[in-house]
Amino acid sequence: MIIFPAIDILDGKCVRLFKGDFNKTTVYENDPVKTAKDFESQGSKYLHIVDLDGAKNPLNRQSEIIKRIALETELNIQTGGGIRSEEQIKDYLDNGVSSVIVGSMAAVEPEKAKGWIKTFGKERIVLSLDVNIVNNEPFVAAYGWQGSSGKNLFDLINGYTLQGLRVLCTDISRDGALQGPNIDLYKNVLNKCPGVELQASGGVAGLNDLIKLKETGVHGVIVGKALYERKFTLREALSI
C-alpha cells in the first residue's frame, strides 16, 4: 500500500480544509516546496498535491508551484484541482508530474475523461470521485465539493469499464476531521467495482487506521492532517 503525504495549496500556502469547507481552513506551512522536500527527506517516494485555488476557480491555478516541486524533488507526484482540459494535463506531465488527478470532469463529463485516459494512458490519470453519503448511498460531488454530480459512485466507476482504472475516493464528511476513514465505503468499492486500483482519502487519524485500510486491499492512502497535527510521523506510516 502506497502512502501519499498530502499538500493542499491555497493562496500559495499549505493548508487543510475541514470537511471540504473553504471557510474552515488551517494554514500549516507557508512554503509548499519546502514541505515537499521535508516529506522526501523522511523517505517518501510519492506526493499528493491538491490545487485548492484551481479547484475553486480554474483561472487561478497554482501550477507553477507544483511544477517547481516536480523539478526540485525526485518524488512521484499526482496532482489535480481545476483540471478542465487536455492541455492542462499535458503541461503537468511534460513538466515532471507523474499523474494528473481529474475530479469534476470525471463525474460530470465522463466521456471526456475517458478520452484523456485513452490519450495519456490509465497510469497517468487518476479519477478523484469524492462522495457525500446520502441514505447510505455514496453520491459523487463536483466543482471543489461545492456542487453535486447527482451520480452514484459505484455506477459511475463501473461506467468506465476499464481494468486497472485508478480511482481516488474521499468521504467528504471524514476529510480533515481526524475521525477515522470510512472503511466500509472502500470495502464496498473494491467489492462492487472489481479491477479498480483504489486510493483512500479522508479521516486517517492514527497508525491503526492505516493498518485497517491496508487490510481492505486499497492500493494507496492519502495522509494529510494527521501528519501536520503530528498524530504520527511519515516514517512510521511508511513502515506499515
Curated annotation (Swiss-Prot):
Organism: Elusimicrobium minutum (strain Pei191)
Superkingdom of this protein's organism: Bacteria
Taxon lineage: Bacteria, Pseudomonadati, Elusimicrobiota, Elusimicrobia, Elusimicrobiales
Keywords attached to this entry: Amino-acid biosynthesis, Cytoplasm, Histidine biosynthesis, Isomerase
Entry's Gene Ontology cellular component terms: cytoplasm
SUPFAM superfamilies given in the database record: Ribulose-phoshate binding barrel (SSF51366)
Protein's name according to its UniProt entry: 1-(5-phosphoribosyl)-5-[(5-phosphoribosylamino)methylideneamino] imidazole-4-carboxamide isomerase
Active-site positions on this chain: D8 (proton acceptor), D130 (proton donor)
GO-annotated biological processes: L-histidine biosynthetic process; L-tryptophan biosynthetic process
GO molecular-function term, one example from the UniProt record: 1-(5-phosphoribosyl)-5-[(5-phosphoribosylamino)methylideneamino]imidazole-4-carboxamide isomerase activity
EC nos: 5.3.1.16
Gene3D superfamilies the UniProt entry points to: Aldolase class I
Pathway info: Amino-acid biosynthesis; L-histidine biosynthesis; L-histidine from 5-phospho-alpha-D-ribose 1-diphosphate: step 4/9
